[in-house]
């Protein structure tokens, strides 16, 4: 079986969905920009030699509809002979795109693929056109389709207080801002055209979603967003709404060496699981455990983790049940997470994996794990190994 390697990984800055940098930039353009950039950064690989493009996107309608992967590839002037498919596993879409490409390479059906994902939540809101089947209520609580209420449920089940959530959210912003100030994101962010507050076209090379002024005291003043009477989850402890894209160049190790390209990491194992939709945010726990089992590793073998911060109330129970509460500041989301950077649904899996690869290199660790919860009760995880 072929070894699957990540040759390169990049992303756009994360733009605010409400009147942000990419308010006049379409999702296809964000995607095409990264496709062109990956190919330009790795000229040894001819675009025509790509076997496929796998691109995650959740709301596949309006500008994100009709197979955005193919639309973006055409905009990027990728040769018409290269196919492209849009992947949807909700929040885990672009990580699923990576898994799909990896399996093609493992079986010998592909040698080189572009993978990634995008979501423009300013142009195509998360709830646009959603119409749940009324019969679902026979098997699943109606509230299971409301992500904020599933986070409230997890917080109550695991004893996660409002104070713990506020502290974690403040940490996310502080760490993301520190990473920005220290240029820790420089190797992953590709400058991307957008418009400033005055409408002037400019190149953005930083995440505009981060709020460096965030404090625990300020967060404590916010009202509950989903359960106004008994709730603890606020807008400040939820992932921000943002627009962005991320992309990776994935190859067989043999093809990468043949072309003189240096792999950054191997895909050591992959896992996806289902869980109770009412606690959808718990999915990273069984997914991570399964991925670790497949890799023959334990949580203690992992040097750094990237865990998508859908909600502070959601990630803290996952950290607790993976036995990592005492290692948060040494191993988990060291450059902040989605609470500060936002969670553009189809982008986030590739985004956290890209950040993870850079952290693995900076911290000089052998193994890293990226994991995410998924709406309606799933979890997905990937273990990476430095080459």
Swiss-Prot record:
Entry keyword Acyltransferase: yes
Active-site residues annotated for this sequence: 91 (acyl-thioester intermediate), 343 (proton acceptor), 373 (proton acceptor)
CDD domains recorded = thiolase (cd00751)
Question: Its pathway?
Answer: Lipid metabolism; fatty acid beta-oxidation
Subcellular location(s) per record: Cytoplasm
Q: Which InterPro entries match?
A: FadA (IPR012805), Thiolase (IPR002155), Thiolase-like (IPR016039), Thiolase-like_sf_Thiolase (IPR050215), Thiolase_acyl_enz_int_AS (IPR020615), Thiolase_AS (IPR020610), Thiolase_C (IPR020617), Thiolase_CS (IPR020613)
Superkingdom of this entry's organism? Answer: Bacteria
Q: Which SUPFAM superfamilies match?
A: Thiolase-like
Its Enzyme Commission number(s) read 2.3.1.16
Catalyzed reactions per annotation? an acyl-CoA + acetyl-CoA = a 3-oxoacyl-CoA + CoA
Pfam annotation, one family: Thiolase_N
Which coarse location class describes where this protein primarily resides?
Answer: cytoplasm
Job of this protein: Catalyzes the final step of fatty acid oxidation in which acetyl-CoA is released and the CoA ester of a fatty acid two carbons shorter is formed.
UniProt subunit comment: Heterotetramer of two alpha chains (FadB) and two beta chains (FadA).
Q: Which family does it belong to?
A: Belongs to the thiolase-like superfamily. Thiolase family.
Protein name per the record? 3-ketoacyl-CoA thiolase
- What species was this sequence derived from? Escherichia coli O9:H4 (strain HS)
Gene designation per UniProt: fadA
